[in-house]
Each structure stands twice: as C-alpha cells, then as structure tokens.
Amino acid sequence: MPISSPGIGSGLDVNSIVTQLVELERRPIAALQEKKTKLNTQLSSIGLVQSYMVNVQAVAAQLGKGDFWTKSVATSSDSTAVAAAALASAVPASYSIEVLGLASAQSLSTVAGAITDASNMGAGTLTITRGTTAVPITIVDGTSLAAVRDQINAAKAGVTAAIIQDGTGPRLVFSGSDTGTANAVSIAVTGATGQLTALSYPSGMTQDRPAANASLKINGLQISSAKNNLSGVVDGLNLTLAKVTTNPVQVTVGNDSATMKKGITDFVSAFNEISRYLSTQTKYDDASKVAGALQGDRSAVGMLNQLRSTLQQTSTASTVYTRLGDLGLELQRDGSIKVDSAKLDAALANPAELSRAFTTLQTGFGQRFKALGDSVLGTEGLLTTRTNGLRDSISRNDKDQKRLEERVARVQERLTRQYSALDGSLNRLNGLGSYVQQQITNWNKTDNRL
C-alpha cells in the first residue's frame, strides 16, 4: 500500500496578519482621538461663552457708571447755520440764537499791475505787525516774488502769502492765520528799493476782506467772538456758526435718551446672544437627534442659571424700578429678553431713577451683571476653571495617545518579528515536507517493482 502525506504548512501573508492585529491594538487610540475631538469642541464652545460674557460684562459696566445717565445732547433747528454740541456739564435748556455776522480772517492783495518784474522785488525790510507783535523780514536785492512769498510764510507772522495770476500780472495775496479783529495786521516797508513798497499796508496793498469778530445774540444778549467756534460762551455747550441767519435758530439741550436707550438695547442683545447659545448647546435636539456640545456640562448649565437668576432679582436701589421688567425688559420662556418699547421709553424720561437702578453698588442692575462677569471670568471663575480643566484633559489625552502609539509600535515590531520567524519555520517545514514526499514516492516505486 503506497505511503501518503498531507501538505505541511504554506507561505504566510505576514503583513496582512500583523496589520489586522495592530488595528485591534489601535482601537483604544481611536477612542482617545474621538474623545479629544469632543474635548476640543467643548473647549471652543466654552471659549464662545466667555466671549459672549465679556460682551455682557462690558455693556453692563457702561450701564453701571453714573456719568452714562447724565449725558446730554444738543439739537439745532438749523444745523447749517448753528451747530451745537453738548458737554458733560450741560444742563437741560433752550436757547434762541441769531447770527448777525461771522468771524473772518483779514485778506490783503497787491494792487493790479504793481508788480511788473517778478524776478527781482528789490531790497528792504518788511515789518508785519499783529496786535503788539512785530515781525521784521529782511529782503535782499535780487530776491524774486516767489522767494519773498516763501520768506513771509517761514516767518509765521500771522499771515500766509500766495501768488495769484489774474491777467494783470502777478499779485501777492496775504491771508490772516486767525479770525477776529485782534488778528488784523499792518505792514511797514522800510529802506525799500524797487517794487517792495507795493507790499506795505495800508498805504500800498488793498484790503479785500477785513478781520472781523462774529456777532450774535443768544436769548437777546449781544455776543462778540473772535472765532466762529464758541466754547465757554454758554456753559456746557459748544456752538459752531456757519452762516448769518434771517430767523432765530433754536438750540435745545436735553437728556441723551437715544444713547441711554442704545446702551440698554445693547445689553439686551448681549444677554440674548449668550442665553440663546447656552440654551442650544446644553440641550438635546429631538428633531436633529444631535446633542449640544455642552449637554451635561455643569459649568455651562450653571452659567445659564446664574444669568437668568441675576436678571430676575429684584433691587432696592430705586423705589421706581425694582425689577428689569419695570423698564420693559421681560424674560421670555426661551430664556431671552423681550423689550417693551413703550415701557422703556417712559423710563428713559426719568434718567435720575434709571441711574440709581443701574449704578448703585451691589444692588444696581448694571453693577450686578458686571460683578457676575468679574466672577465667572476671573482667575478662579466658573468659565476660567472649566477652560483650564478642558485644556488639562486635552493635554492628558495627548500624553495617553503618545504612550499608546509607542506601545502599538512595540507590539507591531514584536508581531512582525514573531510572524516572520513563523513564516521562516513554515518555509523550512515545507521544504522538509517536499523531501519526505519525494522519498515516499521513491519508496512506492520500489515497492511496486517488488
């Protein structure tokens, strides 16, 4: 009976085997990577909450300052004639303003045809006098008109010089640097030769426009000013005169309700922004089957609760406005604030009480939200500690991933070595099996001949 043997061993796909085993070893790393993605998303979300809270804190701090509620605004019935700006010291009042004349700077020019040779104005000394100040300018022979102009401008004597060509030849024009009668100039020319005498005033040049003061009436009181910008004439009010009036202009100073209202609505917008974001990120959306990045995050939920609690607290700072709802700021079911404009406008008519309601330390609404911001954003604050905790978790995750990656690399090296050795052993066994099979075949042939 012939002797037979089954095949012994075969070539192994070492790479495939090792790859599959290593993939099993890498599963904990994949779990860590997924966890890190979630941690990064949470960190980003907490970062947005911090940013939104900074906005709330900033607008609340503004509302918590006393000078915010004392701002005044000036309005003019004709701002093209009289523009008005209220200062911090302004008080509510109304003014009737008539502009009888505007302040002007003096303008002088040489007589037409007086300068025939612009290349050489001659020699002499120009002395420009403004008030009690006299500035001498020495001109040497051979100085051109342009050079004379430049010397005058460099002297800063209260006028600027320019050359104008009007068809009769060059003319030198002087413009006063400042308005008002006190800034009128006279020009004396001494030791002059050539055309330099044409620059004297009043004997040589022509006055095209006199230096003049502004003339106006405020509530019937006659006022004269060297400038068209009047500061300090009316306490707490700056006036800018632009043209002569035919009818009185009414300037009214009142409380800056628009700025106050914007401050309050800015607070509402900042509050709604953080409230809606936290509400969305801390809940599970049944429609999309997606959980918010901060669902179950105690810090985020705590932040949302503190915001709503602070909003609903009553205050004894004002006897008129004890809760924000009295101002028309009502908390809605979704956690946002809705503004009742009629209520808010009525409250803005009483800025003194609003100031008490928002600025009183500890109990004022503005002070409370500023304090909340200081608390949660501070070094040991709720949002800061949560941010630091997430960063620490990400750091530990990175270290764990690195440790496991190093372990997987060692396992891969060991498995590759072991299976390569096994593959070599099987190859040797295959070789031995072939030899044995050959011997068996030979034995069978010998047996058949017998």
Task: Please give the residue ranges for each predicted region.
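Structured, hydrophobic secondary-structure cores that serve as assembly/anchoring elements
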Residues: S279, D286, Q412-L426, N430-I440, ...
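Short amphipathic alpha-helical/adjacent loop interface patches that line ligand
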Residues: K36, L43, M53, Y419, ...
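Amphipathic, heptad-repeat-like alpha-helical segments
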Residues: S45-L48, L429
